[in-house]
Amino acid sequence: MQPKIKLHYVTYQTFPSKKANTLQTIGNLKYLSKNNVDSTLIFPLRKHESSSNESTLKKVYNYEVDIKIRGISHKFPFGKTSKFERLFFLMSHFLWSRQISRSIMKKSEEGIIFFTRSEWVFYYLSKYDLKVTYECHQLSKLKKIIIPISIKKPASKIIFLNEELKIDAKIKKVYDSKIQILHNGVDEELFKTKVQKDRKRVIFSGNLSRFNTERNLDFIIQSFADPKLSDFNLSIVGANESEFALLNKNIEQLGLSERISVEKWVDREQSIKRIQKSSIGILINSENNLHSTKYTSPLKYFEYVYAGLSVVAVDFKAHRVLPNSESISFFKNNDKSNFINAILNASSSSFSSVGLNEFTLDYRAKQIIDFIKY
């Protein structure tokens, strides 16, 4: 067996959290560790509930492999107050990234590979000529300045979640060998239990809002009032307290309580069971955010497909560039008739399991290792 790669995953995310991006981070680290990578997660303790306790994170994220955990003190304002949240995030992210990068530069052992979702960590570790790979999930005006500067360093690389991110980052072609396009993936171990499917059950699973913007689930609920969908049931899984109350009120007013159920957030294992029980999975987002329309590579898509669901998705470019997108039934945003036809089309389409291995986090981890180790 080859010597273990030592990887330090440095991120401004905090743990534990119900956010999908933390599931993605832990999932990647889990399968990197399974593929002979000595992994360390380094993150700020920027919330009251933040914890670097390994047992706590293993329980929340349901993993057993060895991932070293380093929670770093966070003395900056973001996470301490709800006021000026966006400003404090930008300022605190910059200051913490500079602080941790300087600390890493002073103490870094030879042979460590760094991996990050933070553009500022990428910038500073690149500046210090350390071997670092940046996984880019979205873009901003600031990132479009920082990323092209950082990639010029010889030991710096970038993974983009889809082709649109790479195009819009406008990095010179001379650096193409240092760039990889790699979508999200699914943790196949969560699908070991077989569940009987309900052929008429449709599901939306996940956070009901993104970047403090609702995902337009009211449109989905109102569409289910149409007689053409009277044979179908809808499950919505992942509501917080206020969303749970509001959606149930709307459902009751429409007389749909027998066909539409809303559940609060459930753990990952229970969420997967509900997906497995369903036959159609919905991908929907607000059109008011560029990340949602163009850049996202949603974890739920890979879970839906791996569980054997047909997928119905709002017709955004981000969904068009997903792997196997030719099998998705698309609908125009806010077009009820189009959505209903997409559900009916998905219900009559057959699922193909060909190529499912390439949807897994194990496959993704192997691709990451091959990319970063040289």
Please provide the spans of the model-predicted regions.
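Short hydrophobic beta-strand element within catalytic cores of glycosyltransferases
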Residues: 281-283, 303-306, 310-313
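Glycosyltransferase donor-sugar binding loop
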Residues: 205, 233-247
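Acidic donor-binding loop of glycosyltransferase active sites
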Residues: 275-294
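A charged, aromatic-enriched C-terminal amphipathic alpha-helix characteristic of glycosyltransferases
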Residues: 189-192, 333-334, 341-374
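Carbohydrate-associated surface elements
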Residues: 164, 185
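N-terminal strand-loop element at the rim of the active site
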Residues: 11-19, 37-92, 122, 239-243
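Nucleotide-activated donor-binding/catalytic signature segment of Leloir-type glycosyltransferases, i.e.
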Residues: 238, 246-275
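Conserved donor-binding/catalytic core segment of Leloir-type glycosyltransferases
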Residues: 8-10, 159, 186, 195-224, ...
